[in-house]
Amino acid sequence: MKRILFAAAALLVAAAFACARPTDGSAGRRVQVAGVAFYNLENLFDTIPNNPEGRDIEFTPGGPRQWDGRKYREKLHNLAYAISNFTTRTTPYGPAIIGVSEIENRSVLDDLVAQPEIAKWNLKVVHHDSPDARGVDVGLLYNPRYFRLENVTNHRLTAVPFRTRDQMCVVGSLLGQRVAVIVNHWPSRIGGQEQSSPNREAAAALSKAIADSLWRVDPEIGVMIMGDLNDDPQDKSCAKVLGARKDIKDLQGDPHGFYNPFWRVLDRGIGTLAYKSQWNLFDQIIISGNLTEGDNP
């Protein structure tokens, strides 16, 4: 099995890391590098009142935000500008994969990838409507230069007493390595962190079940669980239910265990949001043991 080497980094707006695949088996070998990112797009709604339950009325010209074409275009520009800065010296064409959340529909992603700041990357869109009460979904953008799409499935979280986002599992080939990307936006902390924790634990259990079902069919497939998890790496949903480890060595060579590179990022005082003068790192990318090699990045 080809291994992918990961180096972790955190952005204020996204969780992201880079992966590299050896081009040959020699020492001092050259590698191919691709970036993987997650970005909560924070209520990316169009201006059209097209939800039959009126869940999008807030983001319409007549709604409380007076969400008109100018504001929508400005938001698209700002998001595209931020994404355009996801490039590095080794990934000049941007990330291979960008998981996203808080989007109203597919059309807003089509509008986003058409923005001049990132249109040259030729990003493709993967999206599926969810039953979420606010009318927001998850999605995925990918660059066909790096990633070849094979299959997409959607998984409903039925173990909670409300409508929330589906989990989307995107399977394909990244730098020749077969991978599955499970894009998430887990239930919020409304009602309190402790009181709402069972909802996120249920979401984590669903992600774990999806991964296990993939491995029953293909034991060598690499799995990435990414998203706005509304929990930190050390919280029960991530550390206990998923069993995502802080240190690669704690996997003890288990190809189907999970490693969370963002745990150490949070330990360094870096987060993706702050609340009551304390950083949280809800936006994470968690990877399976068969996508790791060597020591902690």
Predicted regions and their residues:
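Metal-dependent phosphoester-hydrolase catalytic domains
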Residues: 19-28, 213-223, 231-297
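Structured beta-strand-rich core segments of catalytic domains in phosphoester-bond hydrolases
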Residues: 103-187
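Bacterial N-terminal signal peptides
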Residues: 7-16
